[in-house]
Amino acid sequence: MGLFLFIASGCASINYNEIAPNANTFQPKVAVVLPAIKMPEGTEHDIDKVAMAIFDAATTAKRFERVIDPLTAKSQMSNDVDLQNAIMVYTSKLRSVGFSDKESILKIGKIFQADTIIVGEVSKWGYGVYAGEKNGEVGMAIKMVDVATGVIYWKAAHTDKETYHLFKPNLAKMATKLAKKIFDYIPKP
């Protein structure tokens, strides 16, 4: 019975999955995972781990010919003030008012020579006790944006928990597993 429940929960869908009407016809070739990941307060030191988890999932999904990793993007940002400003303007507008700023996304896409921008956000990251059980918990949302139009053509989110007794689960490994689960729902052509 326990094995059946484990298998059934492993096949469960994700909490949120929204696909734009044209997403199945969009044929992106190059994606960049932005290093500007929103994290819960006090956990910013894990940003690179989450960005790499999203990169690994995007690469594994095999939806793109090439995926630019967030550490390369971060390095390029540190050398290019225009890129840094474009990413900060874009992500702040996206998070504060839900607006995908076409001017900023075009700059980002042109600099990286990418046709898709992947933006991540972490809603939960840590350990806690719920109903007497100790858990590690990671919650993540991923958005993919068409550079040419500025339209968010896919967004999805999910949260996973792992119960533990003695050893805390590795949150970075949980994030990688969670990102791959979310990318299982990426629109296919």
Range-by-range predicted roles:
Residues 1-11:
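Sec-dependent bacterial lipoprotein signal peptides
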Residues 7, 32-33:
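Conserved Rossmann-like nucleotide-binding pocket used by diverse enzymes
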Residues 11-31, 52, 57, 62, ...:
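C-terminal/domain-edge helix-coil "capping" segments
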Residues 34-35, 40-112, 185:
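N-terminal segment of the mature soluble domain
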Residues 38-41, 73-76, 123-127, 160-163:
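Solvent-exposed loop/turn segments at secondary-structure junctions
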